Amino acid sequence: TDGLNPPTRPRRAVRPSGANDRWHFRGAGRTVVLRIGLVRLQGARHGHIAALRRAADECDIEIEVHELRKASDLAAADPHAIVLPGGESTTMRLTGNHDTSRLLPALFEWIRSDSSRPVLGTCAGAILLADPRDGGDPLVDADIDRNAYGRQADSFQSTLEATILGRDFPGVFIRAPRFESHSESATVAAMHGEEVVGVRTGNRLALTFHPELSSDTGFHRWLLETAAGAGS
């Protein structure tokens, strides 16, 4: 529902011959294809790929998902939107800033160069957006505490108030960070009780939980719909 039309036929994933880092999900006769860059420095990516595919089906939007490991991957993909997945933020920084990658400097420049570009950062991805540590301003206007929820054993699931979606959302927290504060320029995107668990600055959305581990595609639909709107 939510004012969106269901797809007219099932979507089929097409992996181009010889490609190991790109998925093309065909739409129902659409001619415009959204290119989604999925940062692959460390951490799981399959949940986001599956969520993007389901979201594309629900929105009837044709997408290509490009995995990004190096700065050259970002340039080649020329994405309309970015997903920064969870993982271990320290490892992601080391890998993404290494001379063999340099993805993070290129990515942060890409994000800062156009405030309309949609970005979804989850868990460790939210840490990188709030605390890029590259000498520039934060990419979302919030202070964040890494691993504030503690150990893997302290992970949990709970219903959230997804204010950006206008409804509840099933949240999955795994060694989650915590927003300590946010500026007036940032919009609260999700709440867990009295605690802010999602912050939006422009079209950059940082979530301390893992929406890709839920069957609800609301946040991935937001990314695709925002990218489609920005490109229209």
Explain the meaning of each model-derived region.
Residues 4-98, 217-221, 225-232:
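N-terminal beta1-alpha1 cap of cysteine-dependent amidohydrolase-like domains
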Residues 34, 61-63, 117, 135, ...:
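A structural micro-motif
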Residues 45, 89-91, 126-128, 180, ...:
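Glycine-rich nucleotide phosphate-binding loop and flanking beta-alpha elements
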Residues 74-76, 112-114, 120, 163-166, ...:
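Solvent-exposed alpha-helices and their adjacent loops that cap or buttress functional pockets
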Residues 81-85, 120, 173, 206-208:
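Structural motif
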Residues 134-195:
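Pocket-forming structural segment of enzyme catalytic cores
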Residues 168, 178-232:
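C-terminal and late-domain segments of enzyme folds
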